[in-house]
Amino acid sequence: MNTSHLINCRLVPAASALLFLIACSAEKNETPVPSFNGDRAFSYIEKQVSFGPRVPGSDNSVNCQKYLIDFFDSLDATVDTMQFVHVDKITGKPITMVNIIASFTGYDEDNDEKYILAAHYDSRPRAEYDPDSTKRNNWIDGADDGASGVAVLMELGNLLASQRARVDIDMLLLDGEDYGRPGDLDEYFLGAKDFVLRDVKDKYKFALVIDMIGDKDLRIYREEHSNKYSPEFTDRVWKIAAELGETAFVDSVKHAIYDDHLSFMTIKLPAAVIIDFDYRYWHTTHDTPDKCSPESLASVGRVVATLLYRL
């Protein structure tokens, strides 16, 4: 992902206040939210990184794909893959990439709402910000930038398998998000760009992207595009974070970020991203599991889990 420089409560009469309180209570699902296990989520980061850098088209990527498919299969999710070929602009080499979709059906048989939770599982084929200039063409592990978002989705999958939400949830594991070269957006977000071409707009109400949320020093600000184009849903996320006392979520806008959520916006599907863009090890060979923490994963996981079980 890249960054750009683009872009109350009030007093009411007693009767209205009572209705307000009832409405607020009704918004919350009475079913308790299952406990998000940050330690288990962290182990999923370690497992993904153990395959080596998950650069699109590599054996490492294929092995990680199999692991993720088997994982969600074991939860009895409906798992599908979407394969596409990207031709590298510079080398002309065709690269096969694969998106993975794990679908969890809600318990409400009358429900026709479906939501996307998305994260990219690929890691970057270059480390242009590495302090060691001799390593800037190295592939990176992508523990935070890649594996952390997927790890949160995996643990949320455990929760949904043990206790269904009311609505249908599709977990979308995207390939090719971070393939591009600096300064050229054409070869970023390749999995998301392919996905939105597949007549998906009317199938979903909202897409929430989770990216770079494993940092030990976690600080998540509202992202500018999300806040501008999907304010209602963004407000809902930060309201839940405040309610839960998750202080890593900062209630102000800081960055305008190019990430997978913008691809959903191109088809007018409301979307937002949860991301900590102040990660010191971004696009370096130092983006390794020791820079991440179970506590950070759990903070994000609790917020998103609460959101899911209130939809």
Task: Show the residue positions of the predicted features.
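C-terminal motif of bacterial Sec signal peptides marking the signal peptidase cleavage site
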Residues: 21-23
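N-terminal capping segment at the start of a domain
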Residues: 25-65, 75, 280-288
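Second-shell loop/turn segments in exported
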Residues: 30-35, 50-59, 87-91, 135-146, ...
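A non-catalytic alpha/beta surface segment that caps or lines the substrate-entry region
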Residues: 32, 53-107
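Catalytic-core environment of secreted peptidases
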Residues: 38-51, 75, 94, 98-161, ...
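Active-site-adjacent substrate-binding region
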Residues: 85-87, 215-311
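Acidic/histidine-rich catalytic neighborhood of metal-dependent amide-processing enzymes
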Residues: 137-232, 261
